[in-house]
Each structure stands twice: as structure tokens, then as C-alpha cells.
């Protein structure tokens, strides 16, 4: 069982299997997890829950992860939340584009569970408090 005081991670991915897989990795590592399947849900969940970190797929239906990230970083109540782009965009420049949109880090999927957890922990350790 996850400690209710452990950091809450919002996992945003339109692909249910990916969301569930990332959630399991994180829960197994001691994190609490909330999920969203598109950019609109990501913004709503982030505003309501104030997670410690957001894993954001950039290719989402409706409002994509790029726009959701821009909106969250523009909002005073969520701009401090680290956002890790979790995406299949492995093209040159995708990482830089994600950072320009406001992402704090970039992980290419598929990624190994340990690599994802290491990056989440690294970002939480370097995050500025609200």
C-alpha cells in the first residue's frame, strides 16, 4: 500500500495500457498516482490535485501535451510543478521543443521502468517548492 504522504504523480497518456504500465512502475516505487487521458483532463487534474510532478505525453487527442504544458506553466498555481515530457518523439529538436513549451525534462518512450523512476526522483529532488 502506498503511503498517503508520498508524492503524487499525474500520468498523462491517451493510451490506457501505457498509463497503467507507468502507474504500476510508480506505485511499486512508492508513489501515489493519478491519471489523465488527454490535455483537458491533465489541466483539470493538475489544478484540482496539485501533483508533485506530471508525466506528460505530448501527442494527445484534443488539447495536446504541448498546449497543456503551456497552460499549466502559465498558471500561477501550477507553474512550479515539474513536467516531464514522456513521448515517442525521438526526432532531433523534440527535446528542445518540449523545453520551450515548458517541460522540465524529456524522456523518450518506450523507456525502462527503472529509467523512468530515476528521472522522476531526480526531478522531485531538484524541484523548487511552491
Where are these regions (language model features)?
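Short hydrophobic/Thr-rich beta-strand motif most characteristic of the beta2 strand and flanking loop
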Residues: 30-37, 45
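Active-site residues of response regulator receiver
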Residues: 57, 87
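Charged docking surfaces used in two-component/phosphorelay signaling
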Residues: 20-28
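Short acidic/polar segment at the start of the alpha1 helix of CheY-like receiver
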Residues: 15-19
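C-terminal output helix
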Residues: 111-120
Amino acid at each position: 500500500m502506498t503511503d498517503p504522504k508520498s508524492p503524487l504523480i499525474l500520468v498523462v497518456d491517451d493510451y490506457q495500457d501505457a498509463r497503467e504500465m507507468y502507474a504500476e512502475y510508480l506505485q511499486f516505487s512508492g508513489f501515489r498516482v493519478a491519471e489523465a487521458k488527454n490535455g483537458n483532463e491533465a489541466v483539470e487534474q493538475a489544478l484540482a490535485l496539485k501533483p508533485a510532478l506530471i508525466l506528460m505525453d505530448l501527442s494527445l487527442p484534443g488539447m495536446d501535451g504541448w498546449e497543456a504544458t503551456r497552460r499549466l506553466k502559465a498558471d500561477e498555481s501550477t507553474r512550479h510543478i515539474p513536467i516531464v515530457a514522456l513521448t515517442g518523439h525521438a526526432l532531433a529538436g523534440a527535446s528542445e521543443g518540449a523545453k520551450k513549451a515548458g517541460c522540465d525534462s524529456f524522456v523518450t518512450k518506450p523507456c525502462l521502468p527503472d529509467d523512468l523512476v530515476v528521472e522522476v526522483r531526480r526531478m522531485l529532488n531538484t524541484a523548487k517548492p511552491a
